[in-house]
Amino acid sequence: MSQYSQNQSSGAYPTPPVSTGPYMTPPPLGYPTSDISHATVAPVETKSKGDGFLKGCLAAMCCCCVLDACF
């Protein structure tokens, strides 16, 4: 017969601790969270870039119309 009994616990494997819930991984770096400790952020200032974009779009549309009329 075996010298170890099935009913005796040897203490090699202690009982696991009580879990408080499933493990949640932290969000990736830079991901906004609901943590309000970083709420002191300076306001963002926007700057006008002028009307260069609008002029460029109008020039492109005129160029397309001229090419369409020529060919």
From Swiss-Prot:
Membrane-topology annotation of the record: Single-pass membrane protein
The protein's name in its UniProt record: Protein CYSTEINE-RICH TRANSMEMBRANE MODULE 4
Positions of region (Disordered): 1-31
Natural source organism: Arabidopsis thaliana
Keywords for this protein: Cell membrane, Cytoplasm, Membrane, Transmembrane, Transmembrane helix
Expression tissues: Mostly expressed in roots, stems, rosette leaves and siliques and, to a lower extent, in flowers and cauline leaves.
Cysteine-cysteine disulfides: none
Biased composition regions of type Polar residues, renumbered to the chain: 1-12
InterPro entries linked to this entry: CYSTM_dom (IPR028144), WIH1-like (IPR044850)
Membrane-spanning ranges: 48-64
Quaternary assembly: Heterodimers. Interacts with CYSTM6, CYSTM7, CYSTM12 and WIH1/CYSTM13.
KW Membrane (keyword) present: yes
Gene Ontology CC annotation, any one: plasma membrane
Upregulating conditions: Induced by heat in roots, but suppressed in shoots. Accumulates in response to cold, drought, oxidation stress and salt.
Pro residues bias (residue ranges): 14-30
Keyword Cell membrane annotated: yes
Family of this protein: Belongs to the CYSTM1 family.
Location in or out of the cell: Cell membrane; Cytoplasm
Function noted in UniProt: Involved in resistance to abiotic stress.
